[in-house]
């Protein structure tokens, strides 16, 4: 449980968010145990997204939560390597191709800035208001996001 749920890495690729100061630390032991029971058939791996997509089999559902797209030229370096606008396009096109070749249902969450990219590829777009607990300018209001969906192709 790091400060406000923030995920950040230094230039060496090491996680560098403080835990914060809490009078009582919440450790969700029961939720973790329930997840472990439900995830017995899940494969959890740490791979580049291209390698992950190469493991997708017919009938698998795919959910992607990439670093959120900003305006071109905006901050993209959440890790020691950044996820650029070109990477966003490459991922969206690869997901569309996977859906067309294998029929897998695809779901992607992203910022409102990615709406046109996914809509132009034929994804069904759902706009949502997502709560924020972190903000660079101190504004912790909700933000517009999208859930982009390609249904299973039979």
Question: Which stretches of residues belong to each language-model region?
Answer:
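Short, surface-exposed loop/helix-turn segments at secondary-structure junctions
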Residues: 75-83
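Class I S-adenosyl-L-methionine
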Residues: 123-154
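Short amphipathic alpha-helix initiation/capping segments at coil-to-helix junctions
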Residues: 84-91, 141
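SAM-dependent nucleic-acid methyltransferase catalytic core
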Residues: 1-76, 90, 100
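Short active-site-adjacent structural elements
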Residues: 72, 115-118, 134-137
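Short, polar loop motifs at secondary-structure junctions
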Residues: 31, 110-114, 152
């Amino acid at each position: 449980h790091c400060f406000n749920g923030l995920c950040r890495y230094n230039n060496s690729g090491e996680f560098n968010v403080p835990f914060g100061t809490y009078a009582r630390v919440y450790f969700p032991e029961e939720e973790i145990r329930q997840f472990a029971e439900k995830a017995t058939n899940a494969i959890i791996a740490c791979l580049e997204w291209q390698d992950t997509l190469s493991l997708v089999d017919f009938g698998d559902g795919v959910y992607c939560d990439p670093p959120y797209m900003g305006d071109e030229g905006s901050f993209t370096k959440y890790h020691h390597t950044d996820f650029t606008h070109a990477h966003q396009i490459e991922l969206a096109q690869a997901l569309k191709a996977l859906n067309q070749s294998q029929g897998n249902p695809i779901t992607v969450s992203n910022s409102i800035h990615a709406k046109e990219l996914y809509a132009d590829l034929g994804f069904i777009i759902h706009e949502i208001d997502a709560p924020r607990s972190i903000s660079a300018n101190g504004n912790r209001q909700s933000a517009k996001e999208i859930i982009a969906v390609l249904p299973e192709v039979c």
